[in-house]
């Protein structure tokens, strides 16, 4: 029996907090869409040439690209795949957020790397870089796709599978984001309930 493919979004969620894949995939609880989420989704424009930094010169841009790989165990829809004038393939993702003058967070870089790996698998071409476009501040960031990040993604896939198979929540991280995270009301109760059950045994 083939394993169900993990959505690439789970990679991003895992690097934000490993509790979320547990809640989504084991407890089958997903954060309900808020008005701002719906508004953001409805206004989410397609990736265009003007979203690219100058060093990426497009010959062709394909948007909403479905990708999947039983070998990697991943599937997802890439915002855009750019073929440059030199024949290079560059995966691109739009984020409805801002990063100011800082570097893209690990969760975004890991998700982009996962998409790059899917592109490599499907198109049989090596991907050396990708682009992250942040809609709120207009930042266009070229991100290198390296072996270190590829290994990190493979490890994350393996660990997410382990979480699902064990049906046990991973250890909580002490994140400042917990206070504003919708899932905090579930992950705290789920973890404490499970710990209580184990003590009873």
Write out the residue ranges for each language-model feature.
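Non-catalytic alpha-helical scaffolds and adjoining flexible linkers that form interface surfaces
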Residues: 3-4, 10, 104, 117, ...
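Charged, glycine-rich intrinsically disordered N-terminal tails and low-complexity linkers that flank
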Residues: 1-60
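Conserved catalytic cores of phosphodiester-cleaving nucleases, focusing on short active-site segments
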Residues: 17, 76-101, 113-117
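A generic structural signal for short coil/turn motifs at secondary-structure boundaries
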Residues: 100-104, 141-142
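Metal-dependent nuclease catalytic regions and adjoining charged, substrate-binding loops involved
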Residues: 60, 120-201
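Structural motif
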Residues: 4-11, 107, 169-176
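Active-site metal-binding core of divalent-cation-utilizing nuclease and nuclease-like domains
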Residues: 47-89
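Short, conserved glycine- and acidic-residue-centered signature motifs
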Residues: 105-111
């Amino acid at each position: 029996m083939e394993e169900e493919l993990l959505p690439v979004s789970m990679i991003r969620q895992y690097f934000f907090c490993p509790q979320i894949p547990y809640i989504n995939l084991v407890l089958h609880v997903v954060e309900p869409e808020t008005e701002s989420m719906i508004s953001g989704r409805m206004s989410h424009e397609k990736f265009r040439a003007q979203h690219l930094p100058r060093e990426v010169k497009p010959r062709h841009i394909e948007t909403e690209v479905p990708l999947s790989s039983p070998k990697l165990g991943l599937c997802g829809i890439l915002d855009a795949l750019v073929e440059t004038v030199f024949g290079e393939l560059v995966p691109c993702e739009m984020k409805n957020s801002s990063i100011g003058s800082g570097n893209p967070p690990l969760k975004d870089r890991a998700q982009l790397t996962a998409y790059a790996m899917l592109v490599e698998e499907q198109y049989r071409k090596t991907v050396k870089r990708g682009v992250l476009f942040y809609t709120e501040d207009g930042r266009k960031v070229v991100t290198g796709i390296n072996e270190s990040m590829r290994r990190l993604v493979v490890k994350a896939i393996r660990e997410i599978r382990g979480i699902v198979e064990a049906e046990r929540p991973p250890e909580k991280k002490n994140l400042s984001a917990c206070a504003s995270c919708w899932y905090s009301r579930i992950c705290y109760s789920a973890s404490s309930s499970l710990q209580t059950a184990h003590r009873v045994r």
